[in-house]
């Protein structure tokens, strides 16, 4: 189940950006509600969890999203970890900078799923081949599927 920060009314199909937050890399995906599909977009470098905000601003301007989705890294028992708080902080910063609604989605196993989709064994080669943006796609696709289920 996703949590919401100022969610807009879902009366029209929305364009949505999804983020797979990490301390060194942040994967980004784009999706929309017409076809309920998400696509990997890019991987941004971060320094200790601090992204290049200029790059994020460019993505916001380019895609003009209605909503932002941030993956929430939880332990398998649903308890929070260090990265959970950092991801929440990132989501709050996105909301504060861009005034867009933010929703968090449980991202457990999204990186595993991304590696399987890309048939990648090691983390280092996975980074080069877009594992973070693929994980963002998995996170965003989870949200889109939830929305489709809720509406039908």
UniProtKB/Swiss-Prot annotation:
It is an enzyme of class 3 (hydrolase). It holds the Pfam family RuvX. It is found in: Cytoplasm. InterPro entries: RNaseH-like_sf, YqgF, YqgF/RNaseH-like_dom, YqgF/RNaseH-like_dom_sf. GO terms for cellular component: cytosol. SUPFAM superfamilies: Ribonuclease H-like. CDD domains: YqgF (cd16964). Its EC number is 3.1.-.-. One of its GO terms (molecular function) is nuclease activity. One of its GO terms (biological process) is rRNA 5'-end processing. Keywords: Cytoplasm, Hydrolase, Nuclease, Ribosome biogenesis. Belongs to the YqgF nuclease family. HAMAP family: Nuclease_YqgF. This is Putative pre-16S rRNA nuclease. It comes from Nitrosococcus oceani (strain ATCC 19707 / BCRC 17464 / JCM 30415 / NCIMB 11848 / C-107).
């Amino acid at each position: 189940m996703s949590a919401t920060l100022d969610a807009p009314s879902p009366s029209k199909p929305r364009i949505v950006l999804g983020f797979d937050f990490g301390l060194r890399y942040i994967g980004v995906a784009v999706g929309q509600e017409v076809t309920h599909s998400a696509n990997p977009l890019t991987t941004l470098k971060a320094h200790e969890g601090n992204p290049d905000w200029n790059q994020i601003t460019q993505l916001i301007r380019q895609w003009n999203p209605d909503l932002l989705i941030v993956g929430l890294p939880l332990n398998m028992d649903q308890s929070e970890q260090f990265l959970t708080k950092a991801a929440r902080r990132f989501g709050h910063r996105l909301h504060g900078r861009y005034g867009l609604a933010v929703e968090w989605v449980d991202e457990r196993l999204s990186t595993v799923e991304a590696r399987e989709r890309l048939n990648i064994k090691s983390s280092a080669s996975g980074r080069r081949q877009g594992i973070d943006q693929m994980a963002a796609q998995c996170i965003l696709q989870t949200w889109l599927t939830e929305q489709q289920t809720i509406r039908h």
